[in-house]
Amino acid sequence: MVVLLTGLLAATGCTQPGDTRKSEAQTAPSPTTAMRLDKPKRLLDRWPESVDRSLHKTAQQNLGNLKKLLGGEPTSAIGTAYVTWEGEYLPERGWYRPAGGSTVLISGLSGTVSDPRATLNAAFANLTRLTTVAPTAPGPLGGEARCGTGQDKGTHIEACGWADNHTVALVTFIGFPAAQSRADDFRQVRSQLENPVR
């Protein structure tokens, strides 16, 4: 389904001046107040949380690998999945996924992120089924953000991630139409998940 993160990327090499400008265009200041991630009951107020154990297991494994990127212990964490269908209950799976349903995997945490760019490099380093990864606008919360697309067993995947001084997360859209980018949905999801610490 989704390639699991298995290691860190040591970022090396030279860049051209144009590369730097492109990357900087997709970077904005990180929030100055401490942030946390909160799990909504319905994603974007429309998609229910899945109870499919295999989806949750994948999200939790990705979360475990993201924890290695923090400078210390996480202050909050999310590792879950949302679906665009309600589903029919099957005891052996938890839920049955009808044909045409799409899934959103979310793996993210808050804590100390000392270098958001290097952290995001590491988060994307082993997502080998993504054929294109490019910077994207991070939205009003700032930091670094990028999205990549690929295929897994004929299913379209778009993975987007962000890192700022307080949070790092991956949002993976599985089975959505390839013709439409999920970058706007990604920014809306981030705005729903990332909130100031109270």
Model region roles, listed by residue range:
Residues 21-84:
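N-terminal "mature-domain start" segment
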Residues 79-97, 147-148, 156-162:
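Short, surface-exposed beta-strand/loop micro-motifs that present aromatic residues
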Residues 83-117:
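A short acidic-to-branched-hydrophobic micro-motif
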Residues 118-157:
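Short Gly/Thr-rich strand-loop-strand
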Residues 145-188:
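A short, solvent-exposed beta-edge/loop patch
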